[in-house]
Amino acid sequence: MEITFDGGKIISAHVDGHVIMTDQPVDNGGKGSAPAPFDLYLAAIGTC
C-alpha cells in the first residue's frame, strides 16, 4: 500500500492496482470530489 497526498485535502491510497481517494467536504475546506476519510472508514467497517 502506498499513500499519496495529491494536493489540497485529497489523499489517495494505492492498493493492489486500485486507487482509493478521499477528500474533505466543501464546508471543511475540500472540494468534495471523493468521500471524506471518516465516511470511507465507516464504509470499510460496514463491508467487512
Where are the model-predicted features located?
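Short, thiol/selenol-centered motifs that function as redox-active sites or metal-ligating centers
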Residues: 44-48
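Extended beta-strand/beta-hairpin segments
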Residues: 1-43
